[in-house]
Curated annotation (Swiss-Prot):
Propeptide residue intervals: 31-92
Family: Belongs to the peptidase M9B family. Collagenase subfamily.
Predominant localisation class: secreted
Protein name: Collagenase ColA
Ranges for region Catalytic subdomain: 375-644
Biased composition (Basic and acidic residues): 836-845
Function: Acts as a true collagenase, which is highly active and efficiently targets native tropocollagen. In vitro, can also cleave gelatin and the synthetic peptide FALGPA (furylacryloyl-Leu-Gly-Pro-Ala). May contribute to bacterial virulence in endophthalmitis or opportunistic infections via collagen degradation in the host extracellular matrix (ECM).
Keyword tags: Calcium, Hydrolase, Metal-binding, Metalloprotease, Protease, Secreted, Signal, Virulence, Zinc, Zymogen
Pfam name, any one: PKD_4
C-alpha cells in the first residue's frame, strides 16, 4: 500500500527545505533528490539548512489556505544551538560499489561507515535501481538491522543509523519509481516491524548517551518511512515519558529533542498515511484506543505551560500532534479537550495559540471543547496586524513591503536599492524587460519580513506556508516571505538572501514561461540547476562592476578537486544535495565571464520554452570535456583568489539626502553622457523618495556578433555610470542601467534599448492630506460608537471619499459613521481618504470595547490612588475591572503608566467626574507598559483598569 495521499507526484524541484535548526547549516540525515515537504505526504527524506531561500511546492502555489491546513504538516523542528564541526570523511561509496560486494562484506562496510559516506542515497539512477531491485539483499539489510537492534549498547550504536538511512532511501526511491514498486507496499514496509521491535526491546533503548539518542532518532525516522503497529507505538511511550519527566534538563539538549521529535512525527506520519491510503476513520484502525499512553505523553508536552525560547518548538509540536492524534484516543474528544486547554493557557496570538486554533479548524470543525466557534480568519488578521504592522510602498505601488515593527526603515531602503542592482544586471544578461505574462499576481511584488526567526514561525499560521527555511517565494501570489536576522542567526545577511530571492521573482516574471512548477520545462527538474545557481549568481550584482563572484559561494566549493562537481553533475543537479547551489553558481559565473554565447543560448531556449532543444543542448554541454576542464580550472582560480572577493551590498550613497535637481536637467545630462536618442523620462512615487527612469536608444559601432556586442555595450554602460558619478550631483551614485532588445541596423551597427534608473529629488508638489480620526475611542458591546473625521483635509485638492475599516471585518464610506461592535476587545480602526487628484492617505486609531457599561454601582469599590506611589493590582476572573480615583486641585500634566506583568489583554481608560460617558485619556501599549499623558483640569478622576480577555494577570500602576 502506497504512502501516497491526495496528489500525484509533484515537481520535485519545488522544494521547501524541511529543516529548521536555528538558521545554522546542519546536516543530520541522508540527502535526497527532493527534501521532504510535509505539504504532501510523500516519503520522508532529508533535512537541510534553514539558511537557504526556497521555492514553493505545487501545493503552496495552487491550494488555498484551508486546503493547505488539511494536508499540511506544520510541525516545528527543535532549534540547534551549536554549529556543527565539519567532518572530513575519509572515503566515500556509491551504491554501485556496495552492490558489487557480497552480503557479508556489505554488512561489514555499512556497520563501519556513516550514511553520509554513501554519495547517492535518495537518488534514482541505474545503479540505485540495481541495488534496490535485489529483494534478497533488502531482506538481509532488514534482518541485520534487527540483529544490531538486539545488541547495541550505550557506547556503540552498531551502525543502526546507517542501516536505517539505507532503508529509508529505498522506500523513498521506490515511491517515485515504478521499477521498484514492491518498495511502495505496506506489506513490505511491515517487514521492518520485527527489527524495530528488536531495537525497542533492547534495555539501552532510551534517551541517554549520544549513541542512544542516535538510535532513538533512527527508530522514529524508520517508522515514518516504513510502518508502525500498536506495539511499536507503545515502545515509544517510555521514551516520551522519560523526556517529559526530565524536561527541565533535556529541553536544552538538541539531540534528545530531535529524537523525541522524530518519534512523534514518524508515528503520526505513518498513521495519517494509513488513513489516507485506506480511506478509513480513526476508530476503524488498529491504533484506536490502544495508544492512549502515547497520546497522553504528547498531551503533557502540549500543556507544559510557560513558553520560553528553548521550549516553544516543543509546545507547538505537542499541541499540533495532540490535535492530530487525539481522535485515536479511547476518548475521541481528548484531542479537542487538550487543544482547547492550550488555547486558553497560552497568550493570545502566540504561536501556541495559533496552532491550537488551527487544529480546531482543521480536525474539529472549527469549535472548541465547549462548542464555541473560533474565527480563524479573524484571528489570522489580528495576527498580521500584530506581527506585520508596517507597510512601505515603492514604484507607484508595484513593490510593497509588509514588515515587523523592528525591521528598520534603513533596511527596507537598502533592500529596495539592492533589488535595482540585481534587476539591472539581470535584464542586461537576458536581454528582455517585458513580463512574459502580464496580469499575473507578480505585477505587484510583495515582500513580507518578520522581526526575527521566532516570529517568522508564525508565517505558517498567518499565511499557511512552510517556515523551515530562510525564506520562501510564492510566484502564484507574487509574494516573498522571510525574516530579519543577526550574524549569529544566519550565515547570510538579509540583503544577500533577498538578492537571491528577488532573482527568483525576476526569473518567473521575465525568463521562464508559466507559473513555477507548471509546464513541461519544469518537469524532471530540468531547471533546478539553472534557477538556483542563477539566483546565487545574480546575488553578486553590482551597480557598475557587472556581476561578481561572492565569497560566501566560493567558500562552499570543495578544497579537494576530486570532490568538485563536473559539468554533467552540475547540469543535472536536483534538490537534495545542497552543494549544487555553489557549483551551479560557479558554472554560470564561468559561462558569464568566458562563454557568454553559451550562457545566452541557454536562457534563450528557456525563455522560448523550447524543451526539446534545451534538453539536447544541456546533454551536449554535459559531455563536453573541454568545457569541464575549463570549468574545473575556473573553480580552482576562484578558490585560489577567494580572499580577493567579498559579498556585494548596496553602499551608503543610496541613503544620503541628495540635493534637489530638476528631472529635465537629469534627463539632458544622461542623454549627453550616454549618447542616446529618442529619450523619455518617467517619474515614480515611493514612500521615502521618488525615482525616475530614462529610456532611449543606443547605437554602437560595427557589429562583431551578439556576444562581442554585448560585452562592448556592458562596458560602455558601466563607463557611462562612472562618468555620471563624477558629476556634482550625488544622486547619480544611485543610478543603475541595463540594455535590452539587441539588433543590428542596416549600417551593420548594433543597437540596444537602454534604461537608466535612479533617485528623483526635484522639489515635490505639496500633496499632503491630513487625516484626522479624532481617536482613540471607547464603547460598549452592542452599543453605537460615533466616529468623526472632523479636521481631515487635503492641502492641494478636496477629499472626495472616505473608507473606514473598523477592524472587525466591516467598513463604512461615511465621513462620520456610527458602528456597533459585537465582541469586547481592542480594535485597530483605519481611515483611508482619497482626494480629487486620486491620492490616498491613511491613518489608524484604537477603539476599546467593553462587555458591560460602568454604572454608578461600579464605583462603590473605588480605591483612592496616591500620586507618585507604585500600586500593585490584579485582574482575576470574575473581576474584570479595578476602579481607582484621584483628585487634581490645580491644572497640571498627569502621567499614567500600567505595567502588564503577564501580557494579558488589558488596558485603562480615565474619566472626569463631569462626563462619565466620554473618557479623557486611555492607555497606549509600549511593549508591556500601557502609558498615557494628559492635561488635567481640577476635579475628581476615575481610572478604570480592566481586562478584555479570559486570561488572569497582575499589574503595577503609577500616576505622577
Amino acid at each position: 500500500m502506497n504512502k501516497n495521499l491526495r496528489f500525484t507526484q509533484m515537481m520535485i524541484g519545488i522544494s521547501t527545505m524541511a529543516l529548521s535548526f536555528g538558521s545554522i547549516q546542519t546536516q543530520v540525515s541522508a540527502e535526497e533528490t527532493a527534501p521532504y515537504n510535509i505539504l504532501q505526504m510523500k516519503p520522508m527524506g532529508t533535512e537541510t539548512s534553514k539558511d537557504e531561500i526556497v521555492h514553493a511546492t505545487k501545493a503552496d502555489e495552487t491550494l488555498n489556505f484551508e486546503e493547505r491546513l488539511k494536508i499540511g504538516d506544520f510541525s516545528q523542528r527543535p532549534t540547534l544551538v551549536m554549529k556543527r564541526d565539519e567532518i572530513q570523511l575519509k572515503q566515500s561509496y556509491t551504491l554501485a560499489e556496495l552492490n558489487k560486494m557480497p552480503n557479508s562484506e556489505l554488512i561489514d562496510t555499512l556497520s563501519k561507515i556513516s550514511w553520509n559516506q554513501i554519495t547517492d542515497l535518495f537518488q534514482f539512477n541505474q545503479d540505485t535501481k540495481a541495488f534496490y531491485q535485489n529483494k534478497e539483499r533488502m531482506n538481509v539489510i532488514i534482518n541485520e538491522l534487527g540483529q544490531r537492534g538486539r545488541t547495541f549498547t550505550k557506547e556503540n550504536s552498531k551502525g543502526i543509523e546507517t542501516f536505517v538511512e539505507v532503508l529509508r532511501s529505498a522506500f523513498y526511491v521506490g515511491y517515485y519509481n515504478n521499477e521498484l514498486s514492491y518498495l511502495k507496499e505496506r506489506s513490505f514496509h511491515d517487514k521492518c516491524l520485527p527489527a524495530l521491535k528488536a531495537i525497542a526491546k533492547n534495555r539501552n533503548f532510551t534517551l541517554g548517551t549520544a549513541e542512544q539518542d542516535r538510535v532513538v532518532t533512527a527508530y522514529g525516522k524508520l517508522i515514518g518511512n516504513a510502518s508502525s503497529d500498536t506495539e511499536t507505538v507503545q515502545y515509544a511511550v517510555n521514551v516520551l515519558k522519560h523526556y517529559n519527566d526530565n524536561l527541565s534538563t533535556y529541553v536544552s539538549d538538541y539531540a534528545k529533542g530531535q529524537a523525541v521529535y522524530e518519534i512523534v512525527k514518524g508515528i503520526d506520519y505513518d498513521i495519517q498515511s494509513y488513513l489516507q491510503d485506506t480511506n478509513k476513520q480513526p476508530n476503524e484502525t488498529m491504533w484506536y484506543g490502544k495508544i492512549d499512553n502515547f497520546i497522553n505523553e504528547v498531551n503533557r508536552i502540549a500543556l507544559v505551560g510557560n513558553i520560553t525560547n528553548e521550549n516553544s518548538w516543543l509546545i507547538n509540536n505537542g499541541i499540533y500532534y495532540a490535535g492530530r492524534l487525539g481522535k485515536f484516543h479511547s476518548n475521541p474528544n481528548k484531542g479537542l479537550e487538550v487543544i482547547t486547554q492550550a488555547m486558553n493557557l497560552y497568550p493570545r496570538l502566540s504561536g501556541a495559540y495559533f496552532v491550537a486554533v488551527e487544529q480546531m479548524k482543521t480536525n474539529y470543525g472549527g469549535k472548541d471543547y465547549s462548542g464555541n466557534a473560533v474565527d480563524l480568519q479573524k484571528i489570522r488578521e489580528e495576527g498580521k496586524q500584530q506581527y506585520l504592522p508596517k507597510t512601505y510602498t515603492f514604484d507607484d505601488g508595484s513593490i510593497v513591503f509588509k514588515t515587523g515593527d523592528k525591521v528598520t526603515e534603513e533596511k527596507i531602503k537598502r533592500l529596495y536599492w539592492a533589488a535595482k542592482e540585481v534587476k539591472a544586471q539581470y535584464h542586461r544578461v537576458i536581454g528582455n524587460d517585458k513580463a512574459l505574462e502580464p496580469g499575473n499576481a507578480d505585477d505587484v511584488l510583495t515582500i513580507v519580513i518578520y522581526n526575527n526567526p521566532d516570529e517568522y514561525q508564525l508565517n505558517r499560521q498567518l499565511y499557511g506556508y512552510e517556515t523551515n527555511n530562510g525564506g520562501i517565494y510564492i510566484e502564484e501570489k507574487g509574494t516573498f516571505f522571510t525574516y530579519e536576522r543577526t550574524p549569529k542567526q544566519s550565515i547570510y545577511s538579509l540583503e544577500e538572501l533577498f538578492r537571491h530571492e528577488f532573482t527568483h521573482y525576476l526569473q518567473g516574471r521575465y525568463e521562464v514561461p508559466g507559473l513555477f512548477g507548471s509546464g513541461e520545462m519544469y518537469q524532471n527538474e530540468r531547471l533546478t540547476w539553472f534557477q538556483e545557481g542563477n539566483a546565487e549568481f545574480f546575488a553578486g550584482s553590482t551597480r557598475t562592476n557587472n556581476v561578481v563572484p561572492r565569497k560566501s559561494m566560493i567558500s562552499g566549493l570543495s578544497s579537494d578537486p576530486a570532490s568538485r562537481y563536473t559539468v554533467k553533475q552540475t547540469l543535472f543537479s536536483k534538490y537534495g544535495s545542497w552543494d549544487f547551489y555553489k557549483y551551479s553558481f560557479a558554472l554560470q559565473s564561468y559561462l558569464y565571464n568566458h562563454q557568454f554565447e553559451t550562457f545566452d543560448k541557454l536562457q534563450d531556449l528557456i525563455r522560448a520554452n523550447d524543451v526539446k532543444n534545451y534538453d539536447s543542448y544541456r546533454e551536449s554541454l554535459s559531455n563536453n570535456t573541454q568545457l569541464n576542464a575549463e570549468y574545473q580550472a575556473y573553480m580552482q582560480q576562484l578558490i585560489d583568489n577567494q580572499d580577493k572577493y567579498n559579498v556585494p551590498k548596496v553602499t551608503n550613497d543610496y541613503l544620503i539626502q541628495h540635493a534637489p535637481k530638476p528631472l529635465a536637467e537629469v534627463k539632458n545630462e544622461i542623454v549627453d553622457v550616454a549618447n542616446i536618442k529618442d529619450a523619455k523620462i518617467t517619474k515614480y512615487e515611493s514612500q521615502f523618495f521618488n525615482t525616475f527612469t530614462v529610456e532611449g536608444k543606443y547605437t554602437g559601432g560595427t557589429s562583431k556578433g551578439e556576444s562581442e556586442d554585448w560585452k562592448a555595450m556592458s562596458k560602455q554602460v558601466n563607463q557611462t555610470l562612472e562618468q555620471l558619478s563624477q558629476k556634482g550631483w550625488s544622486g547619480y551614485k544611485t543610478v543603475t542601467a541595463y540594455f535590452v532588445n539587441y539588433r543590428v541596423n542596416a549600417a551593420n551597427q548594433f543597437e540596444y534599448d537602454i534604461v537608466f534608473h535612479g533617485v528623483a529629488t526635484e522639489e515635490k508638489e505639496k500633496t499632503t492630506t491630513i487625516v484626522n480620526m479624532n481617536g482613540p475611542y471607547s464603547g460598549i458591546v452592542n452599543e453605537e460608537i460615533q466616529f468623526h473625521s472632523d479636521g481631515t483635509k487635503s492641502e492641494n485638492g478636496k477629499v472626495i471619499s472616505y473608507l473606514w475599516n473598523f477592524g472587525d471585518g466591516t467598513t463604512s464610506t461615511e465621513a462620520n459613521p456610527t458602528h456597533v461592535y459585537g465582541e469586547k476587545g481592542t480594535y485597530t480602526v483605519e481611515l483611508t481618504v482619497k482626494d480629487s487628484r486620486g491620492k490616498e492617505s491613511k491613518e489608524q486609531t484604537k477603539v476599546t470595547v467593553k462587555q458591560d457599561p460602568q454604572t454608578s454601582e461600579s464605583y462603590e469599590e473605588e480605591k483612592v490612588l496616591p500620586f507618585n506611589t507604585l500600586v500593585k493590582g490584579n485582574l482575576i476572573t470574575p473581576d474584570q475591572t479595578d476602579v481607582y480615583t484621584f483628585n487634581v486641585t490645580d491644572p497640571k500634566e498627569v502621567d499614567i503608566s500600567v505595567v502588564n506583568e503577564q501580557n494579558i489583554g488589558m488596558t485603562w481608560v480615565l474619566y472626569h467626574e463631569s462626563d462619565m460617558q466620554n473618557y479623557v485619556a486611555c492607555g497606549e501599549d509600549e511593549g508591556n507598559v500601557i502609558k498615557g499623558k494628559f492635561a488635567a483640569k481640577p476635579g475628581k478622576y476615575y481610572l478604570n483598569v480592566y481586562k478584555f480577555d479570559d486570561k488572569n494577570g497582575e499589574y503595577s500602576l503609577l500616576v505622577k
